[in-house]
Amino acid sequence: MSKGVLVGVVTDARRDKTVKVSVYRMVHHKVYKKIVKKCRVYSVHDEQNRCARGDVVKIREHVPISATKRWIVVDE
């Protein structure tokens, strides 16, 4: 995967042309020496309102669309 492209799960699709996508990654905890699952939620632009809750989507960085949206949906 190239830089600026992430894969995540749609957690909220109630707004018009906007979905929330949760992106999970595994990191090594420095103190506890264990693998920990981290999550980050992105507001993503969905022009055609095609995404539904639970869909696995690929998102890409984009120029700012609004105050919180800097990502767009590439693939469903």
Swiss-Prot record:
Key words of the record: Ribonucleoprotein, Ribosomal protein, RNA-binding, rRNA-binding
A cellular-component GO term for this protein: cytosolic small ribosomal subunit
GO biological process: translation
CDD domains documented for this protein: Ribosomal_uS17
RNA-binding as UniProt keyword: yes
Any GO MF annotation of the entry: rRNA binding
Domain of life from the UniProt record: Bacteria
InterPro entries, alphabetized: NA-bd_OB-fold (IPR012340), Ribosomal_uS17 (IPR000266), Ribosomal_uS17_bact/chlr (IPR019984)
Keyword Lyase tagged: no
Task of the protein: One of the primary rRNA binding proteins, it binds specifically to the 5'-end of 16S ribosomal RNA.
Similarity field: Belongs to the universal ribosomal protein uS17 family.
Subunit structure: Part of the 30S ribosomal subunit.
Official protein name in the record: Small ribosomal subunit protein uS17
Organism the protein comes from: Anaplasma phagocytophilum (strain HZ)
